[in-house]
């Protein structure tokens, strides 16, 4: 959690350092698809992780980390979180909840420290994800990220 005076990438770096987490932030051109983004970064689509913000009915949020080529399984995630209703908030609510615009969202440096749920397929790999700013991505060891956030690891996705 940060005070909002830093840029997105600076917030990511500061939070990662505070957690003892090694991240590599790169600049990259915009991509029109998951496959194009993977090609630009020299990785496979499954190694690109989407940080999705989900809103619970009590107006609290959680981060759901989902690998490329997969989507949230709403029944699985609702059961895991013990709620009857979840939704993806609109862009303005996601920004208010995290301090990041869609396409840049990451739990690192979020303006509010929401719980993190990681799909089981992400564990054990080096992944890329949003770095707090458009035109940047970060690389991180998924297991180290999971430990840094004391994240819940579970089967929360299904194929797209």
Q: What do the predicted segments below correspond to?
A:
Residues 1-160:
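Extended, low-hydrophobicity, polar/charged segments
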């Amino acid at each position: 959690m940060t005070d909002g005076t830093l840029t997105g990438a600076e917030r990511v770096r500061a939070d990662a350092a505070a957690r003892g987490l090694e991240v590599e932030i790169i600049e990259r051109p915009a991509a029109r698809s998951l496959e194009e983004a993977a090609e630009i970064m020299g990785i496979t689509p499954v190694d690109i992780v989407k940080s999705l913000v989900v809103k619970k009915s009590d107006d609290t949020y959680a981060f759901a980390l989902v690998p490329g080529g997969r989507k949230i399984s709403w029944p699985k995630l609702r059961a895991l979180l013990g709620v009857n209703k979840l939704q993806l908030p609109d862009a303005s609510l996601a920004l208010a909840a995290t301090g990041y615009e869609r396409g840049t969202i990451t739990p690192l440096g979020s303006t509010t420290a929401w719980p993190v749920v990681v799909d089981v397929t992400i564990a054990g790999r080096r992944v890329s994800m949003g770095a707090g700013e458009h035109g940047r991505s970060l690389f991180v060891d998924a297991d180290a990220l999971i430990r840094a956030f004391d994240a819940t690891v579970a089967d929360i996705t299904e194929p797209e």
